[in-house]
Amino acid sequence: MHEQYQPRDIEVAAQQKWEKTAAFKAVEDASRPKYYCLSMFPYPSGKLHMGHVRNYTIGDVLSRYMALKGYNVLQPMGWDAFGMPAENAALKNQVAPAAWTYSNIEYMKTQLKSLGFAIDWEREVTTCKPDYYRWEQWLFTRLFEKGVIYRKNGVVNWDPVDQTVLANEQVIDGRGWRSGALVEKREIPMYYFGITQYADELLADLDTLDWPPQVATMQRNWIGKSFGADVRFAYDEASIGSAGELTVYTTRPDTLMGATYVAVAAEHPLATQAAANDPALQAFIAKCKAGSVAEADMATMEKEGMPTGLFVVHPLTGAKLPVWVANYVLMSYGSGAVMAVPAHDERDFAFANKYALPIQQVIALKEGDATFDASTWQDWYATKDDSTRLVNSGKYDGLDFQGAFDAIVADLAAKAAGEKKTQYRLRDWGISRQRYWGCPIPIIHCDSCGDVPVPADQLPVVLPENVVPDGSGNPLAKMPEFYETTCPCCGKPARRETDTMDTFVESSWYFARYASPDCATGMVDDRARYWLNVDQYIGGIEHAILHLLYARFFNKLMRDEGLLANDEPFQRLLTQGMVVCETFYRDLDNGSKEWITPADVVIERDGKGKIIAATHKADGLPVVVGGIEKMSKSKNNGVDPQALIEQYGADTARLFMMFAAPPSQSLEWSDAGVEGAYRFLKRLYKIVSEYVAGGVAERFVAGELTADEKALRLKLHTTIQKVSDDFGVRQQFNTAIAAVMELLNLFDRTEASRAVRQEVLESVVVLLSPIVPHICETLWSALKPGSELLAQRWPEVDPAALVQDEIELVVQVNGKLRGSVRVAADAGRDVIEAAALAHEQVRKFMDGQPAKKVIVVPGRLVNIVV
């Protein structure tokens, strides 16, 4: 054993050993309980960032812990390799996305290996490889034939200069992010997954999962099951010119008597009709169509509208209600129309006040003296519970929410003007992307036969990999060698679909492919029934809705195809917090900011650790402290994991990541914290090194012990208890590390036999090995020559060690801590009082005064009141 801790040598040796012995190869074994631990796989962007390191270290700690507990562990890794960043990089660097992607994968794989993760690399999957995506193409054809996937027109953002479709986030102030051209809304044919067919099951099964409550709530809200009614407003034939009806869905039919107008989307047929001879309305509709349809933007944008001059008829009162075109109504939601009750909906209230539309109160509170003011919104206006009653509603006056709901819906049904309806906020998933770097959609368009799925024996439809996009549309649509084909049904010339799939499709089933990644006959084989579902899934909360919902949906699709036996993909979910760091910048003359990496800044702090001055290393001049934010390229506040590993070693990086904060909370980067982690590992190495220099021993099993030895063993076994609970139940690794540090502090100051010291050190090495596996490999080899750390079992708590002959009690004087005393575990009150009153520090703070009262809390403390 080397005298000094040398992380580089230790880590290389351990990693080579693990690779040579295939230490983490997962093999199905029906005789052992399995544990499938999965961290969300990375996009191969080029380099790992600290968020990756934190995510994968958490998964590795849990995987190694469960292996020590005797479980058959699977921890795989792969690459979410399709997507826009590769196309953007290809444009910038004039290189094929495939070459850029594969190069990044090789580098990032080296980085992951240097961190010592217990990954079974034989199960690696790469989603841009045909042997992966051929099976999602196969599933696509099956679902298309069953009607779960269908084709219909959808609205997209079209860049007329680049001749391409843009994602919502690529539209900036109504213009294309690259060309700067005004973006148009276009209707084009797209493919959709019928996820709404599974809405009820997706909602109900959330109750079976061990997920953070906030994630389950986010999914429930996204699915958005609501109970309401369809209400049909007959066309006013005098203004519209024909018979017909406008159907709207509302969750508040109880407020129908307060409806004063209806609003339709810019694409609605009534809007189109009204605009035919109205240039101002045409311009407004064009403006609406050019605007963002992203929900976040819709929620914050100013609500605008224009009257159409058309009217519909209120189904209960016969009143004529004006039809408005409004920018907050989307054609893709429901019927593209809403009824407006300004008095009891905050958005409608603001709109009605802006355009001087009628506001009719129909709800009042049963108790209190709250009055309705049509100029000022109050939260109680939107109340729907037993505390309200209807007013100004004719025969419905006095009814509460549920009574009014039922009565009004019954009357609508009697008039054939409406009925109860359960609706979902969730919409079917449009997966067509007019992009190159994605999985080709396996459909052939034939003039005679229509849309024909590619037969299974012609799959995969391989994406050409030697293409360098030029930014002007989808390259596949310009490649006759790709799209020219023959119809599988009639043999006539036909055209292959050139759209590719949303990259969320690949990440929706990768968890299942890991179970049998080499299966050449299907998406999965019988090995999936052994490994699935995933016992522990780890990733950022930013994926709480889309990725996690789509993966749950895919699991059910695969189950219904007979491929999987389980209903849900991920039994337990851990959402780790962000890695954050200080930001620094200087204001430039052009109004922008120059962000300066923290490594180039000299910081001065006050006694409480607050930054009071910051200067640039290069010129010594001040820089502005921008605050703590998520590590990012845009703020230049990232720390390169590779530099950290090279300076301190992977174990230091892992230890800091696990010690600095609980997994679910944000982790604030701290150079001092990294130094502290490194110092602890040096100290651990030194303790074991000095002990081993005196010769190793057999660990303590049974025998006579001194009081100090008993105290040390008590601390050891309570630490084992705590670390086991922190790892296996609470998943709070920072407190587990703190407990081991406390144990080592006691170890350092306790005289004990070599057998007891051996027991403590062996246990410490095993307890820490999931977090810092490299150093623990070396320390174990020194403590137990000839045995393998990975073959060990997690330490068991010795009940005998928890039985105390003596206990330590805290002693307070007037409620303030002044010392502690050790007494026999069965000591009586008199003995405890005498010991406390005889304590030197206690006598000092009593200052000769007699004790008015002595309070003894058994097993915990003594409080002397003077």
Curated annotation (Swiss-Prot):
Q: Where is this motif: 'KMSKS' region?
A: 630-634
Q: Report any Pfam family annotated for this entry.
A: Anticodon_1
Q: Where's it found, cell-wise?
A: Cytoplasm
Q: What is its EC number?
A: 6.1.1.4
So what does this thing catalyse? tRNA(Leu) + L-leucine + ATP = L-leucyl-tRNA(Leu) + AMP + diphosphate
For biological process, the GO terms are: leucyl-tRNA aminoacylation
**Position of motif 'HIGH' region?**
42-52
Enzyme class label: ligase
Keywords carried by this UniProt record: Aminoacyl-tRNA synthetase, ATP-binding, Cytoplasm, Ligase, Nucleotide-binding, Protein biosynthesis
Q: What is its main location?
A: cytoplasm
| Top-level taxon in the UniProt lineage | Bacteria
> Per UniProt, where does ATP bind?
K633
Q: Which InterPro entries match?
A: aa-tRNA-synth_I_CS (IPR001412), aa-tRNA-synth_Ia (IPR002300), Leu-tRNA-ligase (IPR002302), Leu_tRNA-synth_edit (IPR025709), M/V/L/I-tRNA-synth_anticd-bd (IPR013155), Rossmann-like_a/b/a_fold (IPR014729), tRNAsynth_Ia_anticodon-bd (IPR009080), Val/Leu/Ile-tRNA-synth_edit (IPR009008)
Would you tell me the Gene Ontology cellular component terms?
cytosol
- GO MF assignments: aminoacyl-tRNA deacylase activity; ATP binding; leucine-tRNA ligase activity
**Keyword Lyase in annotation:** no
Is Cytoplasm set as a keyword in this record? Answer: yes
Q: NCBIfam families, from UniProt?
A: leuS_bact
> What family is this protein classified in?
Belongs to the class-I aminoacyl-tRNA synthetase family.
Protein name, as recorded: Leucine--tRNA ligase
Q: Which organism is it from?
A: Laribacter hongkongensis (strain HLHK9)
